[in-house]
């Protein structure tokens, strides 16, 4: 069954809703954005998350030191990296890497040393989908996440199209820029039923 990552969580209520509804991954955004949390906030929220639900730190062009500190402090089970990053440094930390790839026009470079790939819209967190016809995943040899404009209304179609390891949502479970408990529940139900 397709796994679910709920990203950009910053409140106890949203974390509780995601966990109780069956999320497999919880994403904490450390990159500068409206969803950014501090290490201290993430550490506090992480204490509410059972071991079976994996905690993912989301970064844009991080340094190795930033990753190591976050992995240890929160603690994180995986890191997700957007932007510039030397994947050879992955051997220097102890958790799996999710490498984000923005899908734009034309062929994207799908080769990566990361443990997972995450395919997203050109502007992550924008609520926009990418053109699903631009991405060919049949030849991929590693598990991948699909993100970008997913909602409870289109996630089943996405799963049928790609058969991904996991789907990732942030703005698709928000109302007026805030996580919406009912939308979180509906999204997870749409994937898991």
Swiss-Prot record:
User: In what pathway does it function?
Assistant: Amino-acid biosynthesis; L-tryptophan biosynthesis; L-tryptophan from chorismate: step 3/5
> Catalytic activity annotated for this protein?
N-(5-phospho-beta-D-ribosyl)anthranilate = 1-(2-carboxyphenylamino)-1-deoxy-D-ribulose 5-phosphate
Q: Does the keyword Amino-acid biosynthesis apply?
A: yes
The record's listing under InterPro entries reads: Aldolase_TIM (IPR013785), PRAI_dom (IPR001240), RibuloseP-bd_barrel (IPR011060), TrpF_fam (IPR044643)
How would you classify this enzyme at the top EC level? Answer: isomerase
Gene Ontology terms, MF aspect:
phosphoribosylanthranilate isomerase activity
EC number(s) reported in the record: 5.3.1.24
Q: Which GO terms describe its biological process?
A: L-tryptophan biosynthetic process
Keyword terms, alphabetized: Amino-acid biosynthesis, Aromatic amino acid biosynthesis, Isomerase, Tryptophan biosynthesis
Is Isomerase tagged as a keyword?
Answer: yes
Q: SUPFAM superfamilies of this UniProt entry?
A: Ribulose-phoshate binding barrel (SSF51366)
Tell me which family the UniProt entry assigns to this protein.
Belongs to the TrpF family.
Question: Sorted alphabetically, which PANTHER family does this protein's record hold?
Answer: N-(5'-PHOSPHORIBOSYL)ANTHRANILATE ISOMERASE
Q: This chain belongs to which protein, by name?
A: N-(5'-phosphoribosyl)anthranilate isomerase
Q: Which organism is it from?
A: Streptococcus mutans serotype c (strain ATCC 700610 / UA159)
